[in-house]
Amino acid sequence: MIRDLVAAASGAMPILIGEFSFRAKDSGLPNTQGAGLLLQTQTDRANAYERYVNAALADPRVVGIHWYCWADEPREGRADGENSNFGLVNIHDEPYEVLVKKMTEVNGKIQAIRNGR
């Protein structure tokens, strides 16, 4: 999927993936507004993150990726209605531990993977 998106967007030019995220049903949020896959659990989110990053790293044209966003949106929705589990933390600033742990693990390997080690 990443390879197809990158090829369509950039040809041979470098590309920065500006926003991506995955939502999960077990967050307790409605998740009725907002883009991206709606998965079952936070573990599924963590595994999807790892697959996505590894796919991005496999393409030398991808020079960076950016997770959307720090905190979940409110259950009632923000001004445009988005009410989804996009965050690394919930609205009480409590981290989704399994996701944060996986991100820490994966992000710690990015440079080595990109350098072929």
Please give the residue ranges for each predicted region.
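Generic detector of leucine side chains in alpha-helical contexts
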Residues: 5-6, 16, 29, 37-39, ...
